[in-house]
Amino acid sequence: MNTKNLFFALLASMTALTATAQETYQDTKLIGNDLNGTARYVGMGGAMEALGADISTMTSNPAGTGFFSRTQVSVTGGLVWQNGVESHSVSGGHKTNASFDQIGIVAPLKINGKPCINVGFNYHKSRNFDQILTASGALSMASQNKLSAIKYDKVGEWGWNAIDANYQKILEKTDDQGKKYMDYYNGQAFDFGQYQHGYIGVYDFNISGAVSNSFYLGATVGIHDVNYRSSSTYFEQLEQNTNGASAERLKIDGTGVDIKVGAIFLPVDGSPFRVGLYINSPVFYDLKLRGDAGSGFVQYSGSNLSSNNSSAYIRNYCNYEYKIYTPWKFGVSLGHTVGSYLALGATYEYSDYGSIDNRVIDGTYYDPWNGSAYDTSSSDDVMNAHTERTLKGVHTLKLGAEFKPLPTLALRAGYNWVSAVFDENGFRDGSLESPGSGYATSTDYTNWKATNRFTLGLGFQASKNINLDLAYQYSHTNGDFYPFMSYYGDTNPDNNCIVRATKVSHDRNQVMATLSYRF
């Protein structure tokens, strides 16, 4: 059996999807938002939190919908694709995917024929998880199974996960004195492939309006629907004519709720210059992660452990439900218009990712009045401390402009800069005595750096009531990939398990179209 066939055996044995737990690197998938919404919003780089008058602003600054004087319905869809990647031979994946991005309505409620307050509903895809990630590199005196062997001697002090348990079942031995120990193979090279897909869909319910001609307020309640899927495979070329393999299937489902409030005011009489301020509460998530891990070896003739070609693999899995409370988000935005032909916007946002609250469900509360049952939870202090060390405060800058050379034609451009989420020295710590580490079914992680986004857009007024908007977005992020955490023991390389970073990048393109109807 060759290494690739071993992988197919591992994947075939993983028929029931099961679960892992809350963990710093998994958390970040739920927090960061893509630049998505209507094509007009994306084409202007999303810098419309002060300009308003776009349905997508209800998910950041809810006061933005207060500028609508007519009912508007809009729907958005398009394509997303990656540059410079190929589907991995085992984990698979699609480079190009269709995406349904947005649908919503804003309607003014009128009293005596005059607009009084606006109400709105909008669905948008806040995260599109479609991504192929591949990495390969050299190993020296290190391997995934060696890290498990080092942890074996520290059981009771360090966390023990599904990968460790798999290797233990294959490599655990007993010496002449009857003492158990865990053997290992040093690695020479690795190859990793992952296909992530799914989305987070946000259903926003909005109310907004003008307190005066120069002051607007708004509030939004958001329901977040999490659908995350991942399939990853990991090969190691090992010493003694041996190859190693591990595979993971991961599924995250759940819901969350948040509240957004915001204001827009015009500080200068007679001037269209606007200032927007807004606060987004944490998203209070209830989540279920299901994961399955398989690990194994192929030993060829000549190995000192086998005189004939042979293979061994084992499967492990776990179930876990938990809660995550994401950080607060604060934003300030500036907007200005010149006549009816030029609009300029700038937005700054800040969110402290290190303040994520990972929570463990530790009981059930029964309400004696109505007989309902509710989960009770407490903070996972160990994982929260790791999150605080590993993640940083994230700054987002959004710039956008719209120019109308004709009343029926708009040209748009935008730019985003999102600072790095991870500390450059951060790592996925599999030794933590936390459910997030103990229930893990993989060891890899990537420290992604800052993200740059560039956008272009076109707007066409097809009639008095119909608009067609188009947008293109390119985003680029570099990162450092690690197949597992490093362990530094002492000057003896046999007591170390050190892996160097492999440079990776994520280049994504998106084209989208929005059809809007006003009445």
Q: Would you name each region that the model predicts?
A:
Residues 22-36, 106-519:
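Outer-membrane beta-barrel porins/channels
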